[in-house]
């Protein structure tokens, strides 16, 4: 029996310091041996958002410990690692540089290959960590830095069907939470507040809802929330605004996802249609429920990766590294950090397509 490759993955693109060790089984499917994630919520809470310099400093302080924890939990020794995969972009360059430099140094010290990974590719292929999916499939990536519809055709093969033309959905959730007085990161709390409110209290805008294909826009919605928040006087009104915001997002995603379905089907005449949702916002139960029902209505199989691999994590980075390792797609140690790095290189660059701000 041949030795299965062991890949160390490192992720520091924003405010999570993460490391993971993965291998594969006899069928070639990835197996997560460890997946350690250290969040920086307490570091950034008082500022109401991520401060890049503080995030980078925290990465520097923690990365040695996090990588060691990943190795310890995996039960593997340093010398057993076959390759090191680090996120090279997109993201905050001061944060990317920490994990990228560490990964290069680690790989060099054990004389093993180094692999640079696109953070978005990690999200795009993350379902492969838990499901033996066939290509192609339709992906909705919704996180704090990205909101995109992508046709996933395989490693390195992506076609962007739609993207946000301004702000990411996760950012809209976090900014709305901040305006309502919810502590950072408040996005996940919006759903809880919405349960206490009337979703029909406010008629909020749905930017480009009837144009732009399956492109998305949330800047106008954020502006409307800002104006209304200045008139709010009671806690119940805050709950009502949260509920109206949640409802509006669901309506936008329902309409745009149906358009994405139609576009995907035009390009792919296949029997089994698969729709995957990844990214931190995929944890929102109301959005999940709406999208699951939409899939049933349109004969799509819906797949939501587990919460621990929906957000930023190193298992998805290691998994992409594993696929590249098997194809001997290695990188030189002078590979640069890429704060802007689109998956579909042929697509027009838009603010929300491949950059975290």
What is each residue range found by the language model?
Residues 17-23, 139-141, 147-151:
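Short beta-strand scaffold segments in enzyme catalytic cores
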Residues 35, 77, 192-275, 282-298, ...:
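A contiguous, well-structured pocket-lining segment that forms one wall/lid of small-molecule binding clefts
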């Amino acid at each position: 029996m041949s030795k299965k490759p062991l890949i160390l993955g490192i992720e520091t693109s924003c405010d999570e310091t993460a490391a993971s060790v993965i291998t594969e089984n006899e069928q070639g499917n990835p197996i997560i041996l460890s997946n350690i994630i250290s969040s920086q919520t307490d570091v950034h809470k008082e500022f109401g958002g991520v401060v890049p310099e503080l995030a980078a400093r925290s990465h520097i302080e923690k990365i040695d410990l996090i990588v060691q924890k990943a190795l310890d939990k995996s039960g593997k020794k340093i010398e057993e690692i076959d390759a090191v995969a680090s996120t090279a972009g997109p993201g905050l360059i001061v944060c990317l540089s920490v994990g990228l430099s560490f990964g290069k140094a680690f790989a060099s010290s054990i004389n093993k290959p180094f692999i640079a990974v696109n953070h978005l590719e990690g999200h795009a292929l993350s379902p492969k960590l838990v499901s033996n999916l066939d290509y192609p499939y339709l992906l909705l990536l919704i996180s704090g830095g990205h909101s995109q519809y992508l046709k996933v055709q395989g490693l390195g093969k992506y076609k962007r069907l739609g993207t946000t033309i301004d702000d990411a959905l996760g950012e809209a959730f976090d900014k709305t939470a901040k305006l309502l007085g919810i502590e950072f990161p408040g996005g996940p709390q919006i759903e809880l507040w919405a349960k206490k409110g009337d979703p029909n209290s406010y008629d909020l805008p749905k930017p480009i809802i009837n144009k732009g294909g399956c492109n998305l826009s949330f800047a106008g919605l954020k502006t409307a929330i800002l104006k209304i928040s200045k008139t709010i006087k009671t806690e119940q009104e805050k709950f009502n605004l949260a509920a109206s915001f949640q409802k509006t997002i669901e309506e936008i995603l329902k309409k745009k996802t149906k358009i994405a379905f139609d576009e995907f089907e035009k390009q792919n005449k296949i029997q089994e249609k698969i729709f995957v949702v990844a990214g931190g916002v995929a944890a929102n139960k109301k959005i999940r429920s709406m999208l699951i029902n939409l899939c049933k209505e349109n004969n799509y199989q819906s797949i939501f990766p587990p919460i621990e691999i929906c957000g930023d994590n190193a298992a998805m980075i290691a998994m992409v590294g594993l696929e590249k390792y098997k194809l001997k797609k290695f990188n030189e140690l002078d590979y640069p950090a890429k704060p802007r790095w689109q998956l579909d290189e042929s697509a027009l660059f838009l603010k929300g397509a491949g950059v975290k701000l």
